[in-house]
């Protein structure tokens, strides 16, 4: 489908000014340019234009875009002028071979996240560290977090693994604490059961002693009776 027809289809009877997201992936671009996308899309915040033969974004209107997914061979200098509010830029699979191609992105002061997956530039030595040196405003590169004050790009994975280990350690401590609580509760229950057994055992002994006393008393009475009868016979 041609890009113009695709835009008309995505409008769904809405005015361009009411549209905040627009996905034009796989729509054909006549002469490799954007078409039918005008500054009437004044509230547009997300635009995706992947595949479809786009070779230039020189006719991109000025927009409030915050997120842009783009498959284009060059001309990124246009973005700083036309989309100054960009915070997320996805350029995966583009023919970007060196850092000079993305150097114009320095002008995007609000840019926080950049994706260059499957671009040749990612094969350069110290690729990540050099990108962050070039684009100081970035926080994420290829979905990896970066803190300019902490560690070099090469240590990001170790940093993330360390966070995972800390979380596991916290979970283990919580488990140990819970296990200790359970053990303490079980110990208290055993002590209570032991006390109950002692009490019941004591009661049983008292009852046995009482019964023995009754038997002895009866035997004594019988002996006294026999003695009295013997004396009377005499």
Curated annotation (Swiss-Prot):
**Where is it made, tissue-wise?**
Expressed in activated stem cells, such as mobilized CD34+ cells and cord blood CD34+ cells, but not in resting bone marrow CD34+ cells. Expressed in a variety of neoplastic cell lines, mainly in prostatic adenocarcinoma cell lines. Not expressed in normal prostatic tissue.
The terms under GO molecular function for this entry are: histone binding
Q: Which domain of life is it from?
A: Eukaryota
Q: Where is this region: Disordered?
A: 161-234
User: InterPro entries from the entry?
Assistant: AN32, Leu-rich_rpt, LRR_dom_sf
Keyword annotations for this protein, in alphabetical order, are: Leucine-rich repeat, Repeat
Q: Which residues form a coiled coil?
A: none
Describe where the LRR repeats fall, as residue ranges on this chain: 44-63, 64-84, 85-107, 111-134
**Gene Ontology biological-process entries:** nucleocytoplasmic transport; regulation of apoptotic process
Q: Where is the composition biased (Acidic residues)?
A: 163-226
Q: Which GO terms describe its cellular component?
A: nucleus; perinuclear region of cytoplasm
KW Repeat (keyword) present:
yes
One Pfam family assigned to this protein is LRR_9
Q: Which family does it belong to?
A: Belongs to the ANP32 family.
What is the name of the protein in this document?
Putative uncharacterized protein ANP32CP
Originating species? Homo sapiens (Human)
What lineage is on file? Eukaryota, Metazoa, Chordata, Craniata, Vertebrata
């Amino acid at each position: 489908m041609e890009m113009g027809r695709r835009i008309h289809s995505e409008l769904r009877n809405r005015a361009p000014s009411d549209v905040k997201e627009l996905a034009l992936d796989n729509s054909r671009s006549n002469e490799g340019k954007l078409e039918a996308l005008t500054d009437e899309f004044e509230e547009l915040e997300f635009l995706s234009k992947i595949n479809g033969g786009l070779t230039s974004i020189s006719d991109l209107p000025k927009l409030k875009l915050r997120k842009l997914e783009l498959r284009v061979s060059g001309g990124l200098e246009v973005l700083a002028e036309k989309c100054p509010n960009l915070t997320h830029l996805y350029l995966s699979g583009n023919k970007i071979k060196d850092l000079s191609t993305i150097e114009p992105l320095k002008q995007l002061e609000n840019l926080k996240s950049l994706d260059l997956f499957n671009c040749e530039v990612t094969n350069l030595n110290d690729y990540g560290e050099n990108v962050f040196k070039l684009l100081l405003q970035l926080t994420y590169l290829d979905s990896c977090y970066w803190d300019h004050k902490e560690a070099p790009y090469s240590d990001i994975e170790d940093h993330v693994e360390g966070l995972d280990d800390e979380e596991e350690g916290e979970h283990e401590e919580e488990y140990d604490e819970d296990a200790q609580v359970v053990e303490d509760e079980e110990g208290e229950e055993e002590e209570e059961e032991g006390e109950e057994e002692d009490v019941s055992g004591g009661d049983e002994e008292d009852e046995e002693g009482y019964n023995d006393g009754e038997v002895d008393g009866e035997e004594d009475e019988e002996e006294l009776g026999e003695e009295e009868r013997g004396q009377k016979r005499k």
